[in-house]
Amino acid sequence: MTYYRVRLPDNSPESQIGCFCLFENARLMADANPGYCVFVDGEKVYPA
């Protein structure tokens, strides 16, 4: 299963504000919180 984590660009676990199974939900959370990105296994996937 893939987990999409919403964090600040430095990918620090302390900055995580959400973890989702669906990319669309993670993207919406990141878009609603300026400065946040979506990560999968430590790699930024959104925004590209």
Give the residues covered by each predicted segment.
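Short aromatic-glycine-(Arg/Gly/Cys) micro-motifs in beta-strand/loop hairpins
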Residues: M1-Q16, Y36, V40
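Aromatic (phenylalanine/tyrosine) cluster motif
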Residues: Y4, F20-F23, Y46
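Small/flexible residues
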Residues: R7-P9, M29, Y46
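Acidic, low-complexity, intrinsically disordered interaction modules
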Residues: N11-S12, I17, C21-M29, N33-G35
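Short, mixed-charge low-complexity intrinsically disordered segments
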Residues: D31-A48
